[in-house]
Amino acid sequence: MAFDDKMKPVNGQPDQKSCGKKPKGLHLLSSTWWCPAAVTLAILCLVLSVTLIVQQTQLLQVSDLLKQYQANLTQQDHILEGQMSAQKKAENASQESKRELKEQIDTLTWKLNEKSKEQEKLLQQNQNLQEALQRAVNASEESKWELKEQIDILNWKLNGISKEQKELLQQNQNLQEALQKAEKYSEESQRELKEQIDTLSWKLNEKSKEQEELLQQNQNLQEALQRAANSSGPCPQDWIWHKENCYLFHGPFNWEKSRENCLSLDAQLLQISTTDDLNFVLQATSHSTSPFWMGLHRKNPNHPWLWENGSPLSFQFFRTRGVSLQMYSSGTCAYIQGGVVFAENCILTAFSICQKKANLLLTQ
């Protein structure tokens, strides 16, 4: 603009001095090439302006693209974060599922071990029955044959259970190996593992029922064996002979009624005088979880424990447990249950064990 203003007096106004002599300092403007130079300069300025505008527009577009790209990156980050969170939850759920499966397998393994122990006890009792069968006196050949046949059947059933338990142990081992490979398995394979565990649990329950039936048969065999051995022995029928005494397991009554029942049979409630007596009673009651009255009682906690014959209790064999310090109007009486002697109110109902001397002359 300043350059054009300087040009106005030269182009538009008459210069009085131009007639006589050339003006000083403006000899360049009066040359013939300044006009093309100005046009060229104006074009360059215009081109630069257009270039700047185009570049600014491109910069804005690039900025918008960068913002859109940044938004896409943020959205992808959120998606990736959600996917990672979902994957982590799935892994946690898988770990929890595997932990539950392992706990179930540990529980089943423990149950199998318990059943194996019970089976060993049954086998030992069966062996004792076989030995007692050989020592049975004055038993008829037919009775012995029937008992032996029943024992053979019991052995066969026990062997069958043993084989099935081995199969269950093998299945359990296979489940444990499958659990170690659970990370490679899909949800379908885990469902199959759970179904196998459910099937194994059902089989265990069935075997438990069968063992309970075998226990009952074993008890019946013991009672039948004792009856066969005592049919003409030193004890009356249905009584169990051991050393110098005969024993009878009687129905459930309170302590006083049980004592009267034993007296009516010319006997008394159980009295333990030796360690051998205690071991015999513990073995005879091991098959049952029911309580059995003994001939031991006292009127109140300040009185000593006395047997029916008036002799005091010797604590070298056992000690009583339970509420022995509590006072009852009917007194406190002792019963044996699960190999432990307890003290309780005499008015309660329990089974009883009658005891009397054996007629050893019949064995000579």
Swiss-Prot record:
Glycosylation-annotated residues: 72, 92, 138
Manganese found in the keyword field: no
Keyword terms of this UniProt record: Cell adhesion, Cell membrane, Coiled coil, Disulfide bond, Glycoprotein, Immunity, Inflammatory response, Lectin, Lipoprotein, Membrane, Palmitate, Receptor, Repeat, Secreted, Signal-anchor, Transmembrane, Transmembrane helix
Sequence repeats: from-to residues: 96-141, 142-187, 188-233
Cytoplasmic side: 1-31
Extracellular side: 55-364
Transmembrane portions of the chain: 32-54
Coiled-coil regions, chain positions: 83-233
Lipidation (S-palmitoyl cysteine): 35, 45
PROSITE patterns: C_TYPE_LECTIN_2 (PS50041)
Disulfide bonds: 235-246, 262-354, 333-346
Keyword Disulfide bond recorded: yes
GO terms assigned for molecular function: carbohydrate binding; identical protein binding; low-density lipoprotein particle receptor activity
GO-annotated cellular components: extracellular region; membrane raft; plasma membrane; receptor complex
Compartments it resides in: Cell membrane; Membrane raft; Secreted
Annotated spans, Neck: 55-242
Record-level GO BP terms: immune system process; inflammatory response; leukocyte cell-cell adhesion; lipoprotein metabolic process; negative regulation of miRNA transcription; positive regulation of superoxide anion generation; response to hydrogen peroxide; vasoconstriction
Major place of residence: membrane
Summary of the function given for this chain in its UniProt record: Receptor that mediates the recognition, internalization and degradation of oxidatively modified low density lipoprotein (oxLDL) by vascular endothelial cells. OxLDL is a marker of atherosclerosis that induces vascular endothelial cell activation and dysfunction, resulting in pro-inflammatory responses, pro-oxidative conditions and apoptosis.
PANTHER family referenced in this protein's UniProt entry, alphabetically: OXIDIZED LOW-DENSITY LIPOPROTEIN RECEPTOR 1
Assembly and interaction partners: Homodimer; disulfide-linked. May form a hexamer composed of 3 homodimers. Interacts with HSP70.
Name recorded for this polypeptide: Oxidized low-density lipoprotein receptor 1
Species name: Rattus norvegicus (Rat)
